[in-house]
Each structure stands twice: as C-alpha cells, then as structure tokens.
C-alpha cells in the first residue's frame, strides 16, 4: 500500500535530518462567489515521486449481468452495482499497489478529486484504529465516481463504505456537481465529517486535517454518528473558541511540512490577512482579497514561495516543502460551470508531471477518449508519453531556473492565456451542439477538441525538449550567455 511506503520514506528522511518535499498532495477548493467567473473549483496536485507515470483515460459505461466483487491490493473488498457510469480518470500506469483513479468526471457531470493524505493523531488511532483492509486512496474514486449522480450521493456513498468497511487511511477529498461542492475528511477508522464548501470562501489543503466546528445538525453536514461522542467518551475531545474542533480532536499537531503550505497559500490569496507562520490553529476557510481566477490557481500549484524569505528555490531553503513540488505526477484544476449541460459537467485543466514548467490543457467532462500520449503505460522513460515528456522538460528546467526554465514557463503561460481566452467560445459551441444535436454530438466535439489541443501542445513540447537538451549540452560546464528561448524559430 502506498501509505506504508510513504510512511517508511518519511521516517528515513526524518532520521537523516529533515523531511524532503517528495511525498504528498496539496488540495484547493473555492466556492462560486469566491471566483472571478462564478465557477466552483476543486483542484489538487498529486504528489509522490519524480518518476511515476500517470495515465489519462475514459472508462466506458458498463452494465453487467450481475454485481461484481471488487478487491484491491490491500484486501479491501466490496460488491459493486451492475451498472457503472462512464467516467474519466487519471490512474497509475503501474498498478501493483492499486489503481489510483485520482480525479475525473462521470457522465452525470459529477467531479471527484481524491485524495489529500492526512494522519489521525495517536489518541484517535487508539480509540478508533485504521482498518488495514479498509477504504484507501487507491480505490476510493474507482468504487465511488462511477456509481453516483450527485456530489451529495458521493459523500453519502463514502460515508456508508467507511461505516461498514472502515478506512485504511486518513484522507481528505472533494466532490462537486453543478449545484454544490463538498469537502470531506476521513478522520480515523470509522469517523468522518463532510461539509458543503462555502460559496464565498476558498481553502488551501495540505496533508493536515483542518475541519473546525462541525454542526452535525446542519443539512450541509454529513458526519459519522459518533464523531463527537467517541472522543468525549475516550477523553480526547478538544474545543477551540468554545466549540468542538474536529481537526484538533482527531488530527496531529501541525508541523512545518504542512504549515508552510497553509501560510504560503493563504498569504498569496489573502495578503491583507497577514497570516502568521507561527499560527497554531489555522482556519480552513478564507476569503480572498480579490476574486480568484483560473490563472491564480495555476500559479498557486506552481508556487514555491519565490516572493518570500522561504523561497524554496534557494539552497538554504532546500528542506522547505513548496506547493509546486518536483514530485507532482499531475496537477488538475476542475471548473464546475453551471451554464454547461449537466452531462458535460465542467472543464478539467490538466498539467502532466509537476506544473512549474508544464502546461495546463482543458478537457470537458464528457469526452469519450484521450490522445494516445496520455495512454502510454511505460514505467520507464518513454518519449512518446505525455507524462515522461513533461517530466523531462521540468527536470532540465529546474537545473537552472533563470537560464533554462524562466522562458519555458513564460512560453506556457502565454499558451495557457490563449486557451483561456478561447474557452468561452468553445463553451458556447458545445452548448449549441448539445441543444441542436444532442448529447452524442456534444461528446464528439469535446473529444475531438481535447485531442486536437493536446496534440498541438505535445508537438510543441517535443520541440521544446529537443531544443532545451541541445542548449544544455552546448553549455555544459559553463554559464550560458543568455537564457534559453523555446521555439525561437516559431517567433521569427
């Protein structure tokens, strides 16, 4: 199981004198009134390893003759319904430890991103231990997203699974549809809490529980029946500000690994708040100083605190955990667009590998296929793979960000700006097709558009990598006289 592998590496790294920035995800959510375009956003960087291929694929709708029993690598087993809906997913290429369908849309326009790992505290684990063969990140999307029609249904399905099978890990996840977004924390073996995302707020989510006062009587809350009773009975119940605090009760004490991402992300979007690095209890929900744009979230997922004294690009800050980590295997931003037909759902902006020198490309939720480079399953480097190509560009770019990476990042930013500017016209076209010709015509358009845009970006990335390798080879052992310029011939 991946969590066991990560825990072992963290222990080794800590014993060696510090935890690296190698291991876990960072999430982000925002309500529709917090964003500039009125879209709800759920987003995450999937972080584990700098050499871990991911596949972007579409699972077709399936109707089986009888229910099937699903069993994963750690022994979690569950009977699944006969009918599974079509869904998109970004899964592991090598699946000996699990599928890890990390994010996607289903045919009902429901989007799910799972998970951000988090650890229960010692008292919580003693009172309600994690279940070795319970629900884990490896399988959660696979056994939930194809079987739900709303975000609330998704939360309720997870709650039922944790009630009956238990959880193998502490996890944080997000589910959204055209009406609402939900934020959920699986806090221990059988305890959990989920809340609707406030429409006027955002949250930056490191590997740390953050839920505060959970009003279990609210219709906007779904929680385990013993969420409060258990810690009261076992003596680890905690309050903050005179009310029950879920994260303080169930979680670990926050450390630098998580603190720096909360501090960095909240100050980037809410600089007027002047959030202190020494904050002992961080607020989950914040209000941004200005409406949050798609570009803001892209930059957040690339953020290495460059404008602070904790700039992770400096040698003296090598142990600081940035949000934009080199170990991101993919980074995604989902915009839930209420004007789109429900079956279209919204748009996922996907950057393969780490986002710093990669490019975000848009995909509608109703696509039926992806470009072949997204489906290359090689565990070892393969230049035909979208993941491996973008990872290669990132590796070389990070060797000298000023001379190699700066102009690549600028090139992709301009490329993304053009796509963003064109997106409203594409939204209008898919709505027109859906209304005039129906669901299949809209899906055909979405699939063709997604593949064409990805093909163009992949071709440009191939050229950039070839030029960059040539530039680096020519300048090996000496400082280049000027910075690398990608696709210079294109601009002549």
Residue positions per predicted region:
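A contiguous strand-loop segment
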Residues: 23-137, 157-288
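Short, well-ordered beta-strand elements within core beta-sheets of diverse protein domains
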Residues: 141-147
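Histidine-centered catalytic/metal-binding microenvironments
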Residues: 413-492
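C-terminal segment of classical bacterial N-terminal signal peptides
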Residues: 14-22
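Substrate-recognition/cap regions that form aromatic- and gly/pro-loop-enriched pockets
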Residues: 312-436
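Short, well-structured alpha-helical segments that form the helix of a local strand-helix-strand
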Residues: 154-163, 297-301
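Accessory, solvent-exposed terminal regions and/or long lumenal/extracellular loops of proteins
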Residues: 262-317, 321-326, 415, 421-432
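Bacterial N-terminal signal peptides that target proteins for export
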Residues: 1-8
């Amino acid at each position: 199981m991946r969590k066991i592998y990560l825990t072992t590496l963290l222990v080794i790294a800590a014993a060696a004198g510090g935890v690296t920035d190698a291991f876990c995800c960072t999430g982000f959510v925002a309500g529709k009134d917090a964003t500039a375009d009125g879209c709800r956003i759920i987003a995450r960087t999937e972080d584990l390893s700098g050499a871990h291929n991911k596949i972007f694929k579409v699972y077709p709708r399936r109707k089986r003759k009888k229910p099937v029993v699903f069993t994963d690598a750690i022994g979690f087993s569950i009977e699944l319904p006969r009918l599974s809906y079509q869904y998109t997913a970004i899964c592991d290429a090598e699946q000996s430890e699990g599928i890890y369908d990390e994010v996607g849309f289903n045919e009902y326009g429901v989007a799910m991103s799972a998970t951000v790992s988090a650890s229960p505290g010692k008292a919580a684990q003693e009172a309600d231990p994690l279940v070795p063969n319970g629900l884990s990140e490896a399988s959660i999307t696979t056994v939930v997203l194809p079987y739900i029609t709303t975000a609330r249904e998704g939360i309720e399905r997870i709650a039922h699974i944790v009630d009956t099978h238990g959880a193998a890990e502490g996890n944080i996840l997000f589910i959204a549809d055209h009406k609402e977004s939900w934020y959920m924390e699986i806090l221990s073996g059988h305890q959990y809490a989920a809340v609707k995302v406030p429409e006027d707020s955002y949250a930056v989510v490191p590997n740390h529980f953050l839920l505060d006062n959970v009003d279990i009587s609210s219709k906007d809350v779904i929680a385990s029946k013993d969420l409060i009773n258990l810690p009261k009975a076992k003596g680890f119940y905690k309050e903050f500000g005179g009310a029950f605090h879920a994260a303080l009760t169930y979680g670990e004490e926050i450390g630098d690994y998580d603190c720096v991402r909360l501090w960095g992300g909240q100050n980037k979007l809410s600089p007027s708040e002047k959030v202190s690095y020494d904050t002992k209890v961080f607020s989950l929900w914040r209000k941004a100083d200005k409406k949050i744009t798609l570009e803001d979230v892209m930059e957040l997922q690339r953020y290495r605190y460059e404008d602070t004294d904790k700039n992770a690009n400096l040698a003296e800050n090598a142990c600081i955990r940035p949000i934009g980590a080199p170990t991101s295997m993919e980074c995604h931003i989902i915009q839930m667009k209420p004007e789109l037909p429900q079956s279209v759902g919204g748009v996922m902006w996907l950057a393969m590998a780490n986002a710093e020198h990669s490019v975000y490309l848009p995909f509608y939720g109703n696509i039926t296929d992806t470009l072949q480079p997204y489906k290359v399953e090689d565990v070892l480097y393969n230049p035909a793979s979208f993941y491996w190509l973008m990872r290669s560009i990132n590796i070389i770019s990070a060797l000298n960000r000023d001379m190699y990476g700066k102009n690549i990042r600028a090139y992709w930013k301009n490329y993304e700006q053009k796509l963003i500017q064109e997106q409203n016209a594409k939204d209008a076209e898919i709505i027109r097709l859906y209304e005039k010709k129906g669901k299949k015509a809209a899906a055909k358009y979405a699939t063709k558009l997604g593949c064409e845009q990805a093909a163009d970006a992949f071709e440009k990335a191939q050229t950039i990598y070839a030029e960059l390798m040539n530039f680096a080879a020519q300048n090996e052992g000496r400082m280049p006289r000027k910075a690398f310029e990608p696709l210079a011939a294109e601009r002549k």
